[in-house]
Amino acid sequence: MISQIDKAELLERFLHYVSFHTQSKPNAKHSPSSVGQMKLAMQLQKELIQLGLENVEVSKYAVVTAFLPANDPNLTKTIGLVAHLDTSPQCSGKNVRPEVIEEYRGGDIALGIGEEFISPVYYSFMQKLVGQTLIVTDGTTLLGADNKAGIAEIMTALSILQKENIPHCNIRVAFTPDEEIGLGIHYFPMEKFSCDWAYTIDGGEVGELEYENFNAATAKVRFFGRNIHTGYAKGKMLNALTLACEFQQVFPVDEVPEKTDGKAGFYHLEDFSGDIEQVELTYLIRDFDEQNFAQRKAFIKNQVEKFNAKKGLKKPIELEIQDSYQNMYDVVKNVPQSIELADRAMKAVGIKPNHKPIRGGTDGAFLASKGLACPNIFTGGYNFHSKHELVSLQGMENTVQVIIEMLKCKDL
């Protein structure tokens, strides 16, 4: 088990990291998309050097890489650890003011002095956290446990390995920018991250082990109208807003995020913006199955063609579809040791592994597309991307324990 001193160190690290404003910016054309990410990258570079890691570098894109050689000649594997610097653009990450609740007693938790609260009535998992130390928000921002809990856990595990001289394999570490907007990983220096397999430390509840994720794409549908003074609009105005609303009705009403779970895919209208003359709809397309994923993209294309044929518009609606990431399972299944090692590590520290698909994506999906198996490990956090985000300190301890156990590389 981790000592009390290390528990305090873990909490201190986490609280320090969330003080950095690293919210990524949607539609950014360069990485990092925010200055705070580079500031955190430089801080982590300094700490990694202090911990004795080698080849510690920060690229101009704010990708941090480092290496810790094995201290046992019998441990020849190289394992990678990955976490991301940025926080979600879906909720403010500026001026995060965490609140620490010692020995949560159950019931509602008031957040700050406003009207926000979190309740086991809405979040049943809170019943499992009674007696634990919880870190919550003040109700005005997200917390940043996604993914600064993962960063703190990796750094604390490295610190313990070094202080206690625990036998370990070769370790590569990477901290990446702009994971939340799918941008930073495209600047990832694979040549500096040569390893047998890796893990993103970017999951949620204790025990989660994830190695399947959505295939993902984004579709943008643009509508063009014609504006005329409303008093004289009859037979002349063409309202792009009305066209967009009509088009939205063609989608299956039950194939949306709020009505699907498990391995069910969906269409998600993420953004509706514009005016009478021009509107853009942004859809997220998600599915675990590659064939179903292709069919979903074809469905939107066909609906656009039908809509244009039906309306006979002078300027037809336009469609742009861009793939975001692929299901990592096709790569991970060929490296079963990556799953077996995580399984054994969890069981060794008394945690029951919970294999589940990721209804989202991680940097591991991109790394898998480059041939590197990269399952995802829990962080102990919940309610990511929201003011109700929280993390359990005991859950974070569990993650550190699992990381250390994995890096011992027993029976490999």
Curated annotation (Swiss-Prot):
Where, by residue number, does Zn(2+) 1 bind?
Answer: H84, D146, D202
Q: Which reaction does it catalyse?
A: Release of the N-terminal residue from a tripeptide
Cofactor annotation: Zn(2+)
Pfam families assigned to the protein according to its UniProt record, in alphabetical order: M20_dimer, Peptidase_M20
Catalytic residues as annotated in Swiss-Prot or TrEMBL:
D86, E179
The GO molecular function terms of this record are: metallopeptidase activity; tripeptide aminopeptidase activity; zinc ion binding
Q: Which PANTHER family match?
A: PEPTIDASE T
So what does this one do?
Answer: Cleaves the N-terminal amino acid of tripeptides.
- Which family would the database say this protein is a member of? Belongs to the peptidase M20B family.
Full protein name = Peptidase T
Could you tell me which species this protein originates from? Haemophilus influenzae (strain 86-028NP)
